[in-house]
């Protein structure tokens, strides 16, 4: 088991670490937009996002599982359904 990399800083209540090509990422982001849920998106494959990619890998024992969602309370979830993300968002508010 590896150590969890430094948790990325974010100001959003929900930050989705994603890729542009993976269908589960696209679906989650579409569902969040449809619900008008406040969120931020970090493309883990974009240049300059190596630290974010390392964090995503670290939370699943060196496997990069996307989407990974980071909540403003510091908790996270990997590949969550939109309903779970929206429920957590309501809990945070």
Task: List PLM regions with ranges.
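Generic recognition of short, well-ordered alpha-helical segments
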Residues: 27-30, 51-54, 80
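Glycine-/small-residue-rich active-site loops that bind phosphorylated ligands and cofactors
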Residues: 23, 47-48, 76-77
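Thiol-based oxidoreductase modules, predominantly thioredoxin-like and allied folds used
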Residues: 37-53
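Short amphipathic alpha-helix with an adjacent loop that forms part of the alpha/beta core around
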Residues: 51-60, 87-92
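Local sequence-structure signature of Cys/Sec-based thiol-disulfide redox active-site neighborhoods
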Residues: 2-42
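Non-catalytic, surface beta->alpha helical segment in thiol-disulfide oxidoreductase systems
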Residues: 70-93
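Structural micro-motif
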Residues: 59-69
């Amino acid at each position: 088991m590896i150590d969890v990399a430094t948790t990325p800083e974010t100001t959003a209540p929900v930050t989705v670490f994603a890729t542009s090509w993976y269908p589960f990422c696209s679906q989650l982001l579409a569902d969040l937009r449809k619900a008008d849920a406040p969120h931020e998106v970090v493309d883990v494959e974009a240049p300059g996002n190596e630290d974010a990619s390392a964090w995503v890998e670290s939370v699943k024992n060196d496997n990069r599982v996307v989407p990974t969602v980071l909540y403003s309370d510091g908790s996270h979830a990997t590949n969550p359904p939109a309903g779970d993300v929206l429920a957590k968002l309501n809990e945070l508010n």
